[in-house]
From Swiss-Prot:
<feature type="domain" description="Glutamine amidotransferase type-1">
    <location>
        <begin position="43"/>
        <end position="247"/>
    </location>
</feature>
<feature type="domain" description="GMPS ATP-PPase">
    <location>
        <begin position="248"/>
        <end position="457"/>
    </location>
</feature>
<comment type="subunit">
    <text>Homodimer.</text>
</comment>
<dbReference type="GO" id="GO:0005829">
    <property type="term" value="C:cytosol"/>
</dbReference>
<dbReference type="InterPro" id="IPR022310">
    <property type="entry name" value="NAD/GMP_synthase"/>
</dbReference>
<dbReference type="Pfam" id="PF02540">
    <property type="entry name" value="NAD_synthase"/>
</dbReference>
<feature type="binding site">
    <location>
        <begin position="275"/>
        <end position="281"/>
    </location>
    <ligand>
        <name>ATP</name>
    </ligand>
</feature>
<dbReference type="GO" id="GO:0003921">
    <property type="term" value="F:GMP synthase activity"/>
</dbReference>
<keyword id="KW-0315">Glutamine amidotransferase</keyword>
<dbReference type="GO" id="GO:0045335">
    <property type="term" value="C:phagocytic vesicle"/>
</dbReference>
<dbReference type="InterPro" id="IPR029062">
    <property type="entry name" value="Class_I_gatase-like"/>
</dbReference>
<keyword id="KW-0547">Nucleotide-binding</keyword>
<dbReference type="InterPro" id="IPR025777">
    <property type="entry name" value="GMPS_ATP_PPase_dom"/>
</dbReference>
<comment type="pathway">
    <text>Purine metabolism; GMP biosynthesis; GMP from XMP (L-Gln route): step 1/1.</text>
</comment>
<dbReference type="GO" id="GO:0003922">
    <property type="term" value="F:GMP synthase (glutamine-hydrolyzing) activity"/>
</dbReference>
<dbReference type="GO" id="GO:0006177">
    <property type="term" value="P:GMP biosynthetic process"/>
</dbReference>
<keyword id="KW-0658">Purine biosynthesis</keyword>
């Protein structure tokens, strides 16, 4: 295993412009779907190269009052222009998204040959992969980096001879800007006619332009919240470069959703799966408004993995909508359920370790239970539509073709399994929120008259606690010793003699480039935990190690050097790619509770864990403690989501487990940051949470605090 990627050179340059390359198609081979066409006088076309963030680009454009459409990269653009012109619509510009492939790779997505031709003659904004493609096609060079750039970085915008920022794209921005970078390839030779407009803090080309052609490219992601002024960059491209009039308003989105519901459902019944969370509640309220509450059947399925007293709270919350609510206790059905994946029958859910299989079993079982309830009501399944509060991030992370045909699967969401896709393809699934992100759903909920207590409930995944319990029969130890040596040296400067000097030199060089210095007096130490969590890096899925950090001085919570901890949490996954999540392990003094000390020895033991009743009750208890404190300290609105996770790490006490807490802050759940103790969450709140868990939940060795941004860690651990 290596911690860096080899340099892979692109094929030899045969011509100035590679429009005859194997990446092009004569005309797009994807049929244009009328449902993807927006009725607006001006439109920006977003070409999806497989990015997890394509719909976020779409959202940013809409926020600036410009209509947008997402199409596959290989759509027939000239045919699309014809279709748009017939309806009186003009395409004003094109945005090419990022993606997980390399422009020189065998699996690089194809694009329509007219994209960069004079026939099209439209401004183009290439993001990440889009910039690399633009540079490569015009004769530049793209190579694999010696190390990835993943996470928040600063870029330096270049100035011209008059000391003005060199590009229209960056008008009214600062010379130094914070951005999100997630890439393993970089532009190493600029194509003729293009110029560099910004560089990263690592000195890597982060932006190029050809002003004459109206082509602009950035290596970072301006669409996500972690890029501080990304929205301004989009505004500069849309208004100043493309000349959009910005007269497309979003006021009618609720009415559009109602029209969509009526057009699909007509006079039939709709079965709404309601968990009690904001997504399903808003979905139920919207459908009720569209077709009347008498035509809506609200079904709450208790799958056995709910929060403490969840089903009772759901009944109270949904009674205000005046819906016909059915509550079904299907816990035993779920525990014993199986499904078929690629022709293979899975084990029962209670025996399943794989998080992906668990999600698929749960999703398919939801559908089967729902169909059974329809039959009990005397309704024919073909006369009933299924409604779900599916959001855009769910479809993106599941790589649904509704959003993208080429995005990597990060995780399967319970509301986007293969069975749901079959129902969707047959036209029997209604998903009025599929173009919405979480904060937009909350705004819609307010406009529908829902109370704050409903709109601001902490999000809870449909599969429930089943995906907040990390199951394992044995420790994960693939390349454990090497990885442990790497992080020991990275954090402390000390490592076993087995770690080669060449690796140490690389680590020191990377730490210097990232401006991350080790402590003068080493008090923070790492411990590699032998389990895996799900992450997203470079538009792709990772299933990698969890790393713990702890204080050797047993500092209290307010004495912990949090800024240094978060710096390590950003740095470690960038250098050691088989770690995607970093947690801080609270010590004895930090929790004011006599508990188990973290050993300096490698952790190579776990408590075998499955979805058994005792494990579920243990997590329910811990989760309820966290929820109580969130309400007590008025953190329900400021913390977007707080997953509480059971880990099979015993820290030397046979049979024990540990609890991890992820205090996550985000607008759209596509990217986000952890809450900072003492700033976003008080020391007292953390103190009470950890003390209460350790004193009142039996069998818990440690409480861990997640310090990881998204990316590289996903919102949930699994």
């Amino acid at each position: 295993m290596t911690i860096t990627s080899p340099v892979i050179k692109t094929p030899p340059l045969n011509s100035e412009i590679r429009l005859e390359s194997n990446l092009t198609v004569e005309s797009g081979d994807i049929e244009i779907n009328e449902k993807d066409i927006v009725n607006a006088s001006e439109v920006i076309v977003i070409l999806d190269a497989g990015s997890q963030y394509s719909k976020v680009i779409d959202r940013r454009v809409r926020e600036l009052n410009v209509a947008s459409e997402i199409h596959p990269l290989n759509i027939d653009l000239l045919e699309l222009i014809k279709i748009k012109s017939k309806s009186g619509s003009t395409i004003k510009g094109i945005i090419i998204s990022g993606g997980p492939e390399s422009v020189y790779g065998e699996n690089a997505p194809k694009f329509d040959k007219s994209l960069f031709s004079e026939k099209l003659n439209l401004p183009i904004f290439g993001i990440c992969y889009g910039m690399q493609l633009m540079n490569y096609i015009f004769g530049g060079k793209v190579e694999s980096n010696s190390q990835r750039e993943d996470g928040v970085h600063n870029i330096e915008i270049l100035k011209d001879e008059n000391q003005q920022l060199v590009s229209k794209l960056f008008k009214n921005l600062n010379q130094t800007e914070q951005v999100l970078l997630t890439h393993g390839d970089s532009v190493t030779k600029i194509a003729d006619g293009f110029k560099i407009i910004c560089k990263s803090d690592d000195g890597i080309v982060s932006g190029i332009e050809n002003e004459r052609l109206g082509y602009y490219g950035v290596q970072f992601h301006p669409e996500v919240d972690l890029t501080t002024n990304g929205k301004k960059m989009f505004s500069n491209f849309l208004i100043d470069i493309c000349g959009c009039s910005a007269n497309y308003t979003l006021d009618d989105r609720e009415q559009q959703a109602i029209t969509y519901i009526k057009s699909i459902v007509s006079n039939k019944k709709v079965l709404v799966l309601v968990s009690g969370g904001v997504d399903s509640t808003v979905c139920a309220a919207l459908i009720s408004k569209a077709i009347g509450p008498e035509n809506v059947i609200a079904l709450h399925i208790d799958n056995g993995f709910m929060r403490k007293d969840e089903s009772l709270n759901v009944e109270k919350a949904l009674s205000v909508l005046g819906l016909h609510l059915i509550v079904v206790d299907a816990s035993q059905t779920f525990y014993n359920s199986t499904t078929t994946i690629k022709g293979h029958l899975t084990s029962s859910l209670k025996e399943t370790i794989s998080p992906e299989e668990r999600r698929k079993i749960i999703g398919d079982t939801f559908m089967r239970v729902a169909e059974n309830e329809v039959k009990k009501l005397g309704l024919q399944p073909e006369d009933v539509y299924l409604a779900q509060g599916t959001l855009r991030p769910d479809l993106i992370e599941s790589s649904s073709k509704t959003v993208s045909g080429v995005a990597d699967v990060i995780k399967t969401h319970h509301n986007d399994t293969e069975l749901v896709r079959i129902l969707r393809d047959s036209g029997r699934v209604v998903e009025p929120l599929k173009d919405y992100h979480k904060d937009e759903v909350r705004e819609l909920g307010k406009s529908l008259g829902l109370s704050d207590s409903l709109v601001w409930r902490q999000p809870f995944p449909g599969p429930g606690l089943a995906i907040r319990i990390i199951c394992a029969d044995e420790p994960y130890l693939v390349n454990y010793d090497f990885t442990n040596n790497v992080v020991q040296y990275l954090v402390t400067g000390e490592a076993s003699s087995e770690l080669e000097s060449e690796v140490k030199i690389k680590i020191d060089k990377q730490l210097t480039e990232m401006k991350c210095k080790r402590q003068d007096k080493i008090t923070i130490k790492p411990v590699l935990l032998p389990i895996q969590t799900v992450g997203v890096q470079g538009d792709g899925r990772t299933y990698s190690y969890l790393l713990g950090l702890y204080s050797s001085e047993n500092s209290t919570i307010d004495q912990i050097p949090w800024s240094y901890i978060f710096n390590l949490a950003r740095t470690i996954p960038k250098i050691c790619h088989n770690i995607n999540r970093v947690v801080f392990i609270f010590s004895q003094n930090a929790t004011k509770h006599t508990n188990i000390k973290v050993s300096n020895e490698p952790v190579k033991h776990i408590t075998p864990t499955r979805l058994t009743p005792d494990v579920i009750k243990q997590l329910q208890h811990a989760d309820s403690i966290v929820s109580e404190q969130l309400y007590k300290y008025n953190l329900i609105k400021s913390l977007s989501q707080v997953p509480v996770v059971s880990l099979p790490i015993d820290f030397g006490v046979t049979g024990n487990r540990s609890i991890a807490i992820r205090t996550f802050i985000t607008n759209d759940f596509m990217t986000g940051v952890p809450a900072i103790p003492g700033k976003n969450i008080s020391f007292d709140c953390l103190q009470e949470i950890t003390n209460n868990i350790l004193t009142s939940v039996n069998g818990i060795s440690k409480v861990l605090f997640d310090c990881t941004s998204k990316p590289p860690g996903t919102t949930e651990f699994l």
